[in-house]
């Protein structure tokens, strides 16, 4: 009995290999699901997010004044990034709202990338895009998409 080797049952080895592979597969699926969750939370506003009109100094929508376009809704203020196309003939103004959805403050007209700070207590935002070289100074419905595409607004949805 002194020189005998112990042999491991092939079924046992096969079971161990299968268990390890299943654990690796489950871990991979969890990692993908976690990363996908983050990607789904990052949103980009498209043309359909905007309407013709302005946001007045009180943070209210004015659809009678057609010199700009604005986001239709308030969006959660977690992380916001605003980028403009090079040579864009627009500016944008960012409006900050509190939990009561009342205007807290706004930025000056911006013409470059925004990754700024937010007022303390601000929970929501809206964007107004104002053309700087519109022929007649009035934004028409067919121009909305053109102006909206010049400014890319991305935000993280909780």
Enumerate the language-model features and the residues they cover:
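Extracellular ligand-binding interfaces
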Residues: 86-114
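Extracellular or exported targeting regions of proteins
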Residues: 64, 89-96, 126, 145-147
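N-terminal Sec-pathway targeting helices
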Residues: 7-22
